[in-house]
Curated annotation (Swiss-Prot):
Subcellular location, record wording: Cell inner membrane
Provenance organism: Escherichia coli (strain K12)
Name of protein: Inner membrane protein YhjD
Residue ranges that the UniProt entry lists as topological domain Cytoplasmic: 1-74, 157-185, 251-261, 322-337
Record carries keyword Magnesium: no
């Protein structure tokens, strides 16, 4: 080997330190420390009263089949719309029977706007049937509506009680006689209808009064007041929702909930219900623009409304039932008396 080809190795000290081999134990310790930090932070967050309460309510809602009960309530709610439509059909028949000129105007509009003679004749026959059989349809619709309404109320009551009682299984005290159960559900249905009428009346009267005040004081042209009026209308609607849910959570559970939990849970339900109404208000018009939406949009929208209403009601019932207080014997570290 010649001198030129001989490998020359450096004899001076290197200016940098050689790369050390990666220590797997050090890497594992860093990962474990990061995981421990994340776990500790998550535990601290879960120990916060609001988050802990939300977790308890969610666990109870899921463990006690909240989604399944919500789907069942949706089904019975949609099924109960059929007798209501029958009653509405009969009411329209009574109105048309007492106003022959209005009936003739409807026939004229049908002939003007529908070019197909067969379809026009079918619609005229349907309207004539509604007028002629209004009494029969109305009585049958009322009877079926009463029966389905009582059963709907019973299903809603059982679903809320499943979320409200301390244990999942029904106790012997929960068993009621057949006629007592139906009488109780009938009274509850009447109470719910009264509460619904009161809340709708409050919303309607408040909205009309607001419009009268705006028109009387000539406030329409003041732009900065428009958001204020919207907020006032929103507050009135939430208050009406609050009255409705307060009656539901106060009347339907077997045992009366604590006042603080009832007030807060009802407020949560009122806000959630208002959010559902706002979302449905903006979603349905866009859904109805498509051909399929025009055909099925109203049905799907109604089912979605019932489903979200049922889930919200049951979740807030679970939220009220899982509320803990310092003097509550169910809290950790305390024993039942």
């Amino acid at each position: 080997m010649t001198q030129e080809n001989e490998i020359k190795r450096p004899i001076q000290d290197l200016e940098h330190e050689p790369i050390k081999p990666l220590d797997n134990s050090e890497k594992g310790s860093k990962v474990s420390q990061a995981l421990e930090t994340v776990t500790t932070t998550a535990e601290k967050v879960q120990r916060q009263p609001v988050i802990a309460h939300l977790i308890r309510a969610t666990e109870r809602f899921n463990d006690r089949l909240g989604n399944q009960f919500g789907a069942a309530i949706t089904y019975f709610s949609f099924l109960s719309m059929i007798p209501i439509l029958m009653v509405s059909f009969a009411a329209g028949g009574f109105v048309l029977a007492s106003h022959p000129m209005l009936l003739q105007d409807i026939f004229d509009k049908i002939l003007q706007n529908i070019s197909d003679p067969t379809l026009a004749a079918t619609l005229k026959n349907t309207i004539n049937t509604a007028v002629q059989q209004r009494t029969t349809v109305g009585l049958v619709g009322l009877a079926v509506a009463l029966y389905s309404g009582i059963n709907w109320m019973g299903n809603l009551r059982e679903a809320i009680r499943a979320q409200s009682r301390d244990v999942w299984e029904r106790s012997p005290q929960d068993q009621e006689k057949f006629w007592v159960k139906y009488l109780r559900d009938f009274i509850s249905l009447i109470g719910l209808l009264i509460a619904l009428i009161v809340t709708l009346s409050i919303t309607s009267v408040a909205g009309s009064a607001q419009q009268m005040i705006i028109s009387a004081l000539h406030l329409n042209s003041i732009e900065w007041l428009k958001p204020t009026w919207r907020l006032i209308g929103l507050a009135i609607s939430i208050f009406a929702n609050y009255l409705l849910f307060f009656w539901i959570f106060w009347r339907l559970p077997r045992h009366r909930p604590r006042k603080k939990a009832l007030i807060r849970g009802t407020f949560l339900a009122a806000i959630g219900f208002e959010v559902i109404k706002i979302v449905m208000t903006y979603t349905l018009p866009s859904l109805m623009k498509s051909p399929s939406g025009a055909a099925f949009g109203s049905v799907l929208g109604l089912m979605a409304f019932f489903y979200f209403f049922a889930r919200l009601t049951l979740f807030c019932a679970a939220w009220i039932a899982t509320a803990e207080y310092k003097d509550d014997p169910r809290m950790p570290g305390k024993t039942q008396p």
